């Protein structure tokens, strides 16, 4: 799908829409303006990177494993951890568990609770031909 003019990329995986922020201000808009509380949110643990949102219109409690892993791979790819040779830790939680305290810079957030997955960074075009730009 085309995402020109928006502050995020869009990728489809097994019927789920994955949205990938393009920068700090766009990450904030994606997480706090576009995403719904029941959507899933991912970000590489530690280094700077894109906010990744997996839409959850059905309100499932857990993402299918293939969707979770693919979204985590994309989050790792769109981060400073991209060049890592090993697996990268990615935090995953509900958007409802992401908050932005007053005074935090664009793109910076705190998580109330999260799980972590470890994946290799892989570009989104491996899934559907998205150019990532």
Question: What residue spans do the PLM features occupy?
Answer:
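Duplex nucleic acid-engaging cores and interfaces of nucleic-acid transaction enzymes
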Residues: 1-133
């Amino acid at each position: 799908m085309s995402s020109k003019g928006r502050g995020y990329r869009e990728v489809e995986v097994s019927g789920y829409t994955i949205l990938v922020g393009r920068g700090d201000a766009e990450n904030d808009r994606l997480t706090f303006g576009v995403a719904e509380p029941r959507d899933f949110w991912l970000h590489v643990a530690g280094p700077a990177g894109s906010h990744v949102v997996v839409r959850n219109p059905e309100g499932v409690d857990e993402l299918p494993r293939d969707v979770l892993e693919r979204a985590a791979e994309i989050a790792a790819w769109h981060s400073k951890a991209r060049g890592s040779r090993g697996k990268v830790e990615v935090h995953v939680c509900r958007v409802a568990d992401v908050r932005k305290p007053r005074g935090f810079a664009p793109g910076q957030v705190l998580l109330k609770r999260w799980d972590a997955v470890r994946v290799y960074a892989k570009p989104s075009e491996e899934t559907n031909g998205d150019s990532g730009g």
